[in-house]
Amino acid sequence: SYFLAQNGHDVTIIDAMPKLGGMLRYGIPEYRLPKEILQKEIDLIAKMGVKMETNTKVGVDVSFESIKNKYDAVLMTIGAWSSIGLHCKGDDTPGVMGGIDFLEKIAKSKTINLGESVAVVGGGNVAMDACRTAVRMGAKKVYNIYRRTIKEMPADEMEIREAQEEGVRFENLTNPIGIIPGEDGRVSKIELQVMKLGEPDERGRRRPVPVEGQTKVLDVDTVIIAIGQQVDSKLFDGIEKTRKNSLVYDPETYMTATKGVFACGDCGNDKVSIAVESIADARKAADSI
């Protein structure tokens, strides 16, 4: 919106959330990105004349077809908000939640009872954000569960180091195989398969393989799954999608196969980006429009 407004376009943001900012507001914890700084950026965009429609969900409050008909160009920046599940026994037990869902609830100041012991599954930055947020919420034990070693973790080294300094317990070379409820029906334990590194995969990373007969169990009150996100694109009919349900767009022009509909950031071409990369994408897409 900022770059399009700079180029002299009339711009309208349509957002399902009550406040603007997307993943910057609801997916990045306060300690990493203070909301006061984000709000100043949004206020600047508003002063540039950008119209802002919040609490407006496509497919519920407005149809995608009507948006396409109303505007000369539509830029899809919907991100990847749907957490990927574990697909193991007990993964639907009360007390199991997605990493982005957890961070979003915290950003919206919703009450969450984590209990004293939390397991966070995953090795990326969202997993580190969830671990460090759980520590800040008062959890006495926070475990990070990752199926490879700490050297293979995709999270930034600084995030891993600071999580260690804050007391997060790293259970590397383990993979969840079951979540066990207690008498109250909520999460009570997580069962882990001990892993070892095998031969490299197609990307050169050594594959984690189970060590036969070796498992371990941790007592936990909450399990947070942060092994990746998917794009919720089912409401956008007529736009070509990848096998993973991400939007397909031309990497040079950022336009989809639907004329006048563009996409960028994590919602397209199965990309996984950090914030600054998505912003760079947005600048290129705005120039193309």
What are these regions (language model features)?
Residues 1-12, 24:
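Extended interfacial segments that mediate partner engagement and assembly in macromolecular machines
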Residues 7, 40-60, 83-137, 242-257:
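Glycine-rich dinucleotide-binding loop and its adjacent helix/turn
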Residues 13, 17-48, 52, 104-106, ...:
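Rossmann-like dinucleotide-binding cores of NAD(P)H-dependent redox enzymes
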Residues 19, 124-126, 230, 268-269:
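Residue-level detector of alpha-helix initiation sites
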Residues 39-88, 178-191, 196-199, 222, ...:
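Feature captures the FAD/FMN-dependent oxidoreductase FAD-binding
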Residues 76-77, 98, 120, 225:
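Redox-cofactor binding/interface segments in oxidoreductases and associated redox assembly factors
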Residues 92-115, 200-272:
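FAD-site-proximal beta/loop scaffold in flavoenzymes
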Residues 267-289:
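A conserved FAD-binding loop/helix module that cradles the flavin
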